Amino acid sequence: MPIFSNNTGSDAVAGSMTAPEPATATTGRGSNAGKGSGQSESVVRSAGVVSMAVLMSRVTGLLRESVMARLFGAGLIYDAFMLGFRIPNLTRDLFAEGALSSAFVPTFTDYLANRGKEAAARLANLVATALILVVGVVCALGVIFAPQLVHLMAPGFAAVPGKFELAVRMTRTMFPFLLLVALAAQAMGVLNASNKFGVPALASTFFNLGSVGFGVVLGIWLGPSLHLTRIEGMAIGVVLGGALQLVWQLPLLYRLGFRFRAAFDWQHPGLVRIFRLMVPAILGNAAVQINVMVNTNFASTIVDPVRGMDGPVSWLSYAFRFMQLPLGLFGVAMASATLPSISRSAAAGNMDEFRRTLSKSLGMVFLLTVPSSVGLAVLGKSIIGAIYQGGRFQLYDTQQTSVALSFYAIGLAGYAALKVLNPAFYALDDARTPMLVSLGSIGVNFATAEIMIRAAGMGHAGLALSTSVVALFGFLLLFEILRRRIGGIHGRDLARGIGKVLLASLVMAGATALSSHGVERWLGVSQLARLADLVISIPVGLLVFYGMCRALGVDEVDMAISAFTRPVSRRFRRKTSL
């Protein structure tokens, strides 16, 4: 039975596959260079589309966190809420931006290109059915064993009256979010494999808006009549926001002809291949999130001289949330746009094109994330103060969160590069190597965190630094393994470009620091002064960085600007022409 309905016509599906077919990528050595270059630029353009959508997602995510900060501050209630959200949120990062997409997209692309759209659609239905069954069971187990999970992740919560019990309630309330986000991740994979990037990238925006909107309605407006506390309403809002994230993608799937039909065939070779890639990929792609969980365990036991045991978990969470803005904007966007292209190259056996595309993607990641990390470190206090401070989020919270943000920023480039490198291994049908590196990095993180807290006495800042060290460790090790396996990744050109970006970023750091210091002396440290600092210092830093890149011959900077502004300008021209 066809699953891609003929109602839309075969051209509707074929027309969406605008990237070069695998067969055309090997039509002669002489043409490959041009096509490889074209594919690399196509990846950057696709990343631009994704990045604009991801920008909206991250901005609305910050809006959600800002509302939470003002309502609950950084303390017992938000610590418990964040722990309850962390388990399904970990799964979101693994599925939506990692393991499922990395395992499903190459397999689905292979079926779509070599076996036809009906075979590919049947595979998609098999995966969706399996997810409903498997993840549904996991959700049930999570609700039952919530107390044990909370104790495992945050043993220090039991020392604060009421904190452990609230965290258990939050965990049980938000666990169904896991199933919704798993299905949303698969829908994202189908659309990305069909070269539809904007709609799935916007899905997280609808989650953010839905979670805060439903949460405010249920927790504040209707809370008294429904006998819900504010934090309980926000927890239910998370689940409803997850449902909205899935529903947003369904119309485009329908227009492509996709119809869900329950299908059972556990021996299907495509499903077996996906699970074979996915199980180790969960570990191989989970280093950052697992290390955050390890750090949560450590953070729950830290005694702050001012706040006691309430605060460190919240400070780390708020800081890491802001870190996700450039990470999602650049790292996840490049990974989402790169994976289908390198999957086609790997399926066609065209390793020259594979190397070119991967090198271009990594170079673009460093071009965008290195200056971002410098900006986060230099302007951390102004960023956190302008966005979070107010209500129950006090000046002391701003100071402690900005310290964590500065140390997280050290590993930003490593975080983002891992988003591109891990899928490259999966495209080569190798999930074992990232898994082993990830397991090793978890041990490195545990040892580093022990040193930072016990020996150095750095508190929550040491935990942020240990996470960054692990991200850089994982990137360097995976890069070297992949370089040897595929015979190079244009390493000299890549290193030369990164060196230029580092130099430009250092000059930018000096200019931004001078600007920020001048604004502080002029206006002080009020929230208005923080906003003024960002309005003045960010453009100064960007202009200096752009000028240095042009002076050093970093031509990719113009390509990046074009890629990330074209979607907006095209939409603006379309509206003005109406």
Residue ranges of each PLM-predicted region?
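Membrane-embedded alpha-helical bundles of multi-pass transporters/translocases
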Residues: 2-578
